[in-house]
């Protein structure tokens, strides 16, 4: 596989565009093929078997296009399908997971040998939070921290329907999920769905200034770079990169919204 081959990136819909955008920013020589499966969104309320089948269809499409790696820019699809995909294909398959370690590590202060327990909300889809993969992740950190799981399926739908700019709707939806918490005593919110990255500024309105809003995009893209470099597959520095957008929903509305989110 040539180092100039493209990277395939996919999501249940439009959220993974935030990951494609991060690749374009951090690895500008890379050519990205993005596929959003908006016709089948949301994945977060489907069964693991349904998500696996959809994920295999998309990766097969990428393989036919000659990609050198695939990024599953979807926490839900990662939870349901990443292990099976890695067993089936001989190209790197990079998954996502909620950046819980980053959130909990904020309790480790160099000047203090004792961990300061963190109060963390993980906002994600229902399926991500139900899957064994997330349970194992929680097991690593919940003994020294307080971790709240908050499924937020409506946040996916708001992005997919193009209503992200409706401030009243978004804040009303966020308050519906998060007013049950004493936000003044929350240390961070982990955005465990790539759709939710587009809500960062809204979460900032909800949280005290000292609290962090954390997503896994930068870490995922950094890992992608390390993997490609180890295989000698990074694109030449003088290559012209970019992002090509495709979607299972062929409507102009989705195409226009995809372009808009890529350039936010």
UniProtKB/Swiss-Prot annotation:
Coiled coil: none annotated. SUPFAM superfamilies: Aspartate/glutamate racemase (SSF53681). Pathway: Cell wall biogenesis; peptidoglycan biosynthesis. It catalyses: L-glutamate = D-glutamate. Substrate binds at residues 11-12, 43-44, 75-76, 194-195. The keyword Isomerase applies. GO terms for molecular function: glutamate racemase activity. The active site is at 74 (proton donor/acceptor), 193 (proton donor/acceptor). It comes from the Bacteria. Keywords: Cell shape, Cell wall biogenesis/degradation, Isomerase, Peptidoglycan synthesis. InterPro entries: Asp/Glu/hydantoin_racemase, Asp/Glu_race, Asp/Glu_racemase_AS_1, Glu_race. It is an enzyme of class 5 (isomerase). Pfam families: Asp_Glu_race (PF01177). Provides the (R)-glutamate required for cell wall biosynthesis. This is Glutamate racemase. It comes from Bifidobacterium longum (strain NCC 2705). The lineage of its organism: Bacteria, Bacillati, Actinomycetota, Actinomycetes, Bifidobacteriales.
């Amino acid at each position: 596989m040539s180092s100039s081959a493209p990277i395939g990136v996919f999501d249940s819909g439009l959220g993974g565009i935030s990951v494609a955008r991060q690749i374009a920013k951090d690895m500008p020589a890379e050519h990205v093929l993005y596929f959003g499966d908006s016709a089948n969104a949301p994945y977060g309320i489907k069964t693991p078997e349904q998500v696996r089948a959809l994920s295999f269809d998309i990766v097969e499409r990428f393989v036919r296009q000659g990609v050198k790696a695939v990024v599953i820019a979807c926490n839900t699809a990662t939870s349901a399908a990443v292990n099976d995909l890695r067993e089936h294909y001989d190209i790197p398959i990079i998954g996502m997971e909620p950046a819980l370690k980053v959130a909990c590590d904020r309790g480790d202060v160099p000047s203090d040998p004792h961990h300061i327990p963190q109060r963390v909300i993980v906002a994600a889809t229902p399926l991500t939070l139900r899957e064994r993969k997330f349970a194992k992740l929680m097991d690593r950190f919940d003994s020294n921290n307080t971790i709240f799981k908050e499924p937020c399926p409506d946040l996916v739908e708001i992005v997919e329907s193009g209503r992200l700019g409706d401030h009243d709707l978004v804040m009303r939806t966020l308050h519906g999920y998060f007013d049950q918490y004493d936000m003044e005593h929350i240390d961070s919110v982990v955005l465990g769905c790539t759709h939710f990255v587009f809500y960062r500024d809204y979460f900032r309105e909800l949280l005290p200034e000292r609290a962090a809003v954390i997503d896994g995009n930068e870490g995922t893209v950094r890992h992608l770079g390390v993997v490609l470099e180890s295989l000698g597959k990074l694109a030449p520095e003088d290559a012209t990169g970019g992002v090509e957008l495709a979607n299972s929903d062929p409507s102009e509305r989705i195409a226009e919204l995809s372009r808009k989110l890529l350039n936010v």
